[in-house]
């Protein structure tokens, strides 16, 4: 993995920003999974004058899950390296267990339908991760898919 990857300590509280029409080379965070969507987003932002910075949540790996593919963090780091953009990890392992895995487990045991993506978005992506980005990197812009675009 690229030696430029750094861990960003997770800090609170959150704020949110939106994208302006004229980038002028401004840095903008792309939450990177290493998949096609986030990778293409980073490339398209570069192509339109933005200066994307990849950020990936470090989440716990489930013991014995038998996953043979590399973690998404590794994939994201390789994509960022290939694009020539910085990449950072935010350590979210403990909060992920407490705010996503445990509520999922409890809901499932109680016969309810868990909603782990909502919990992750609320407690990690747009709270813990974004705050770490703002405080540690000083970046004020986060790219998100415009409403109504699929």
Place the predicted regions along the sequence by residue:
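ATP-dependent adenylation/nucleotidyltransferase module used to activate substrates
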Residues: 2-150
